[in-house]
Structure formats: C-alpha cells, structure tokens
Amino acid sequence: MYGSFFFYVLQYEAGKVRRHSIMTDDAKILETVIAEFEALTRIPRPSGHERAVSDYLKKRFAEIGCTVTQDEALNIIADLPAAEGCESAPRTILQGHMDMVCVAEPGVIYDSLSDPIKLQRTEEFLTADGTSLGGDDGIGVAEILTAMQYTEAHGPIRAIVTVDEEQGMTGARHLDAAHLKDARFLINCDSEDYHIMTVGSAGSVNLDFSRMLTRRESNLPAYRIAVAGLLGGHSGERIGDGRGNAIRTLALALQSLEKHGKIELVSFTGGTARNAIPPTAEAIIRTEVGEREIVGVLAGEEKRFRSIYGAADPAMKFAFGAAEHTGRVIGAAEQHALISLLTLLRTGVHDMSHLHADKVETSANLGVLRMDDSEVQVQYFPRSSVNERLDEIIAAAQTMAELTGFSLVVGTQSPAWREREESTLAKIMGEVYSAQNGGAQMTVESIHAGLETSWHAAKNPALDMVSIGVTAHGIHTPEERIEIAAIVPEAKLMMETLRRIAHEKK
C-alpha cells in the first residue's frame, strides 16, 4: 500500500535503525504525509471504537522500526531508538490521538462504525465527501509517522497515540505515567494552526448542584419572562469577550421583581451545555405585581445589562407576556435558595493571566438550568490554567451549596497545563519556525480550553511541552478541510526541532 511513498531504506544493525535517504524533497514529504493520513481515513475510528485503528498503528509503527506497546486502553506507545551518535540526547515524545468526531451532511448515508472517510484532494485542501474529515487528529498522527521516518539526526523518540480524546480523554487519563517520566520534551500534534504554538491550557471541573422541590397550587396571574438576543458561545473561546449569561440575567431580574411584591416560581430553565454560554433562558411565574410594574422592572434590568454587557451583547431583550399553560409553584424557601444560588455563582472571567494580559486565566460558566416537577439541577463549569484557582472555586461552591440547601457533586478535575516562564522546547521551536519563515515569529499562546497535555503535565510536571498542528478549518463538521500548503512546513518544523534536540544534553 505504501511502496510508492517510501523514500528510505531501513537497515537494522545492533538494535539501531539507519536511514538512507533516496529522495527527500518537499513533494515527497507531502506525499508521505498524505499517504499515511489516507490510510487512517480508510479505518472507521469514532471515539470509543478504536480497536481497528489501534491494531493498525501497532503494526505501522513496527514497520518503521519502532518497539511498540499497545496498552489495555488501546493507546499506542512506539519507541524509536536514537540515531547513531545521538544516543545521549534527551527523549522526545510526539503525541496525538487516533479517534475522530464523525458527522455527516443531512441526507448523506454514513455509518461511522463501518464506512471509511472518502478523502478528496484539491489544489489547496484535503476534504471529505459529505462527512467530517478526521484531520483532528489523523493529520497529526500522519505527521508523527513521517517525522519518525525522515528525521536523520535525532535522539530517542517515543510516539504516543491515545484513544478517546474527543469524548473523555480516557486514553490520556489512563496512560501509565512511566511512559512520560523518562522523557524531557513532548510535542503534542493536535492543534489547528501551523503558525501558532500552544504552551499552556486550562483545567476544568464539573460542578453539579441539585435540590428536591415541593409543589403547591396558586391562583395568582401567570406570566412568561424570557431572555433572548444574546450571542452565547463556547465558554473557553468566548468567555473573555464580555458576553452576558442568560440564566444569571434572568435570575437577577426575578430577584429585582421580588422587591415589588410576591413572586411564585413555576419553572425556570436555560442553556443546553455546561461548556456553552447560555444565550436564552425562560421562567414562568405567578405574581401579584401588576403588568405595568413588571414591564418597568424589566426595562430597568435591560438598562443595567447594557451598561455592563452592551458592547459585547447589544441585542439582548426581555420577552414578557401572559402564560396560558402553567403548573403548580415551588415552595418559597426553595425559590429563594435557587435565585440566591444563581446570583451568587460568579460567571465569566475571574482572573486574567499574569504572563499574557489579554488571555483569560480563570473563568466559570453557569451553563445549564433544568427544572421538573420534583427537582432543579444547575450545571456550573469553571476553568483555570492554575490548579489552585480551581480548588478555590470548588471550595466556594461547596460553601454556597451548604448555605442554599443544595447538594453538590464535584466531578473529576481535569488538571491544568500551566505555561512555563522558561521553556527550552518553545525556544528551540520558535527559532526553527523563524529560520524557516524568513524571520517571522511564531505566535505563542495559552488556550482557555482543555488538551491532553494537561494530563501529561499532571503525571510528569517536569515535561517541557508544546502543542502544534497543521492548519485546518471547520473541524468536527462536514466542512472540515486541511490546508495542503501547511503540511510540509509542519513536518519540517518537527524534523528540524528534533534535529536540534539531538544536540541537547539529557
């Protein structure tokens, strides 16, 4: 399958792998990466169903001269010996994941468990025919395989390809720390912009509040109040934009209405996912407060909202009207506890990074509010690049739960990957990028979202890590596409970085 794309003759001598390059021009690097990627697209590999692709990678890494371990989780750990003369160099890990998000355009018949991806190639892009492409992270794994074949001078290299990154990071979580502790550097290949080097990411934790409800009848007039027009967005990517949170906005409005007369809550819902800023929320109330007075209170709340969030969320508005179909109201103490909790929980940015003034360090998102006849549930999702900040938020949440009579379930904490103030690997890679791009500087950033590197950092805090990747667009959608022009530069960036590391001391 690969014969037309192999440009090295591998010779084995005393446990060493020696490479004799026949041709190493850019075109052949490109075709090798695409060939490796195309082989992956033929194997169905949705998260949780990685046996076939794991078995394939076990065989493939062995074919290029690696000693391969397949662990119980189906992670692949593949060790390539140092090139001759580079045995004293530190070990570098090249890391990616083998699973993908499988989605299809409406009307496209596609079984993610049995159908291969139909790879398409134009002059500019790699795409798929009607489905997601799986470039996240298939192209990263292909780059790893190519770099391990082409780099002539290198220290010991270990490829780690994990399972289930897209759903639960269970591969990274269950990876034996021994595979990380004998390495000095780790290059994660799961980013989506060749020009950006990521050097830190946020940890997070699921905080789930709940409280049982009692119900009673009420004869007061019933109304519907809703918040609409907010932009919402991903709570990692957009939390720093200063956007409003519909659930908290409506809770504050109900709190203001309580000052004008009796309010009885029938229902209160909002949000769709804990990691999404909720753009809408809705409540059904019964109240003795007159309609004109309610309209006035809501107008005041709109004014207050715009003074805080108007620049980022200019289209916010309240919708108000009579409610035709209502149920029984919840108890007064339960209503007070719920509104208190929703207004006490701090949403949005908590702290900015001390290393990068324009980057968020710590935030929290009040993502989902659900209510049925017998229970109310609140999903709260803090993130931070500093683990101790998450600990503080958890402690505060536990106190709020105690004060308001809510139960709190604290999920497994995803650790932060905290940016190093001095990174040898980032310095080397930045210099290589600049030399290969006419003196241009690589963008260096920490992201306010989770990466597998967070789990690696927790298991070996001494690991010097970066995350890079081939430029891609529309990941996790049928519009996903990979920029072909970025494939070779990415490979050469990795290869030259490995060559320079070969001259580092352990």
Predicted regions and their residues:
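Acidic/His- and Gly-rich active-site-bordering loop/insert found
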Residues: I22-F125
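Zn-dependent metallopeptidase/amidohydrolase metal-coordination segment
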Residues: V33, H354, E361-Q377, F381, ...
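A short beta-alpha structural unit
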Residues: E38, R42, G271-A273, A283-I284, ...
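Fold-level recognition of mixed alpha/beta catalytic cores in primary-metabolism enzymes, strongest
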Residues: G155-A246, L254, E258
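Acidic-enriched catalytic cores of C-N bond-cleaving enzymes acting on peptides and small amides
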Residues: R216-L220, I239-T269, E288-S363, A397-T399
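Active-site-adjacent substrate-binding region
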Residues: N245-F268, E419-L463
